[in-house]
Amino acid sequence: MTIFGPDISSYQAGLNLAKLADASFVIAKTTEGTYYTDGDYEGWRLQAAVLHKPFIWYHFLSGENAAAQAAHTAANVGDKSLPGMLDFEPAGSFSPTLAQAVAYVDAAHAEGLNLRLVYLPRWYWQQIGSPDLGALRDRGLQLVSSAYPGGTGSAPKLYPGDGATGWNGYGRMYPLLYQFTNKASDGGQPLDYNAFRGTTPQLVAALNPAAPASVPTPFPTPTSMEDDEMPAFATGTIEPGKDAVTVVCPPPPGTGSAGWGACWRWGRGFIRS
């Protein structure tokens, strides 16, 4: 199964999500740099919540300080638990570097944002030298690719299929989402549309961090002899026997305030000797 979702911004101002026939999820622009907040973002976020559609925010990267950009996103995203996407592509005379993208990712995570995706078209990845994208992958991000075969019509009609070249990996990452058109007709407007190979619950699971593994109970810090009245050391050997193995010999009798010193062996039961 493959599902579809639009990528929208103020260019689609006034779009009513309830009128979208093909949207199983929604991606909407929230911020750009430190200077811009999308005026339609909050309304779309609330519409998606009412419609129970997975909602993804995105930030358009600028050349400004990464921490300042992340703080700007955090102040406007509305719900930090929502999954987010970094839009990593050039604009005007600015061409972002991989280092700038990684810096924003780190700053966003430090702000508590659930940044999970990076939109990086293959052509721009090639333009910046076809780098290994392990730094993004290792930070928990998944790739969104783009390639437009052309044509007009609905998103399902334009989708080139699960085997399309837009699904091919690069930089040692493979796309979780594939933006396959910028001309899908839906809701009365031409829209960018993305595909996900899976179900809506599978997409939700992929965009949310896994539950943390259980943390082993720390090994207790040794207490003083006064605390437990047992010496903090032992002597002796481990010796094989027919029915028993000597495991631990504490110090000689009378050592410590409790007079420890007996030897315990493991055999058919605990045997004191």
Segments (PLM) and residue ranges:
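Functionally critical loop-and-helix segments that line ligand-binding/catalytic clefts
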Residues: 1-18, 134-227
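Substrate-binding cleft of extracellular glycoside hydrolase catalytic domains
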Residues: 1-118
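General structural signal for secondary-structure boundaries
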Residues: 16, 40-44, 65-68, 132, ...
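Flexible, glycine-rich phosphate/dinucleotide-binding loops
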Residues: 35, 64, 125, 152, ...
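Short C-terminal domain-edge/linker segments immediately following a structured domain
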Residues: 57-59, 120, 208-212
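Catalytic domains of cell-wall/extracellular-matrix polysaccharide-remodeling enzymes
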Residues: 83-160, 164-165
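Short, surface-exposed polybasic-aromatic patches that bind anionic ligands, especially phosphate groups
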Residues: 217-273
